[in-house]
Amino acid sequence: QIAARLTPGRLIGIDRDPKALRAASRRLAPWADRVTLVHSNFSQLDEVLDNLGIEGVDGILLDLGVSSPQLDEAERGFSYMADAPLDMRMNSEDSLTAYEVVNTWPREELRRILYEYGEERYAPQIAAAIDRRRADKPIATTLELVDVIRSAMPPAALREKQHPAKRSFQAIRIAVNDELGAVGRVLEVA
């Protein structure tokens, strides 16, 4: 809708996921003369605008979090519903993966991100369960992580409507992709 309504304006789309950019390019093809898509993190907005020779913008719209297509691709490791390697990177060129977060970050840091980024009330128990499991062998897949999370939760929590791993997966994904840091950086520039 935005691209269709621009008359003299230009829409700059920034995404760190190359597949999302390809999909956006197809979707926005009718307005290609008004749209520029850039493979970057939106936290690099100032650099992107400098490279395009743009000195200011009239508005900014941030589409945060994970998309349905990313969840649908099990091999990306975002979903707690399908078995896949622990990845969760929005941009596969980034180095930090969910595997590294889950298997190498200190227990207290895991507890912190589970609580702060996922609002997980069982964060201490889940972090402790992860710490115990990875002491035996690394947690390598999404469903292995789901099993560890389930093992740390009381039976009543497992009966709740929401999937028991939802908040933890959200927290780990946010940490892997530095999503809150990216928002903070783009707001500083905006």
Identify the residue ranges that each predicted region occupies.
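S-adenosyl-L-methionine-dependent methyltransferase catalytic core, i.e., the SAM/SAH-binding region
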Residues: 1-190
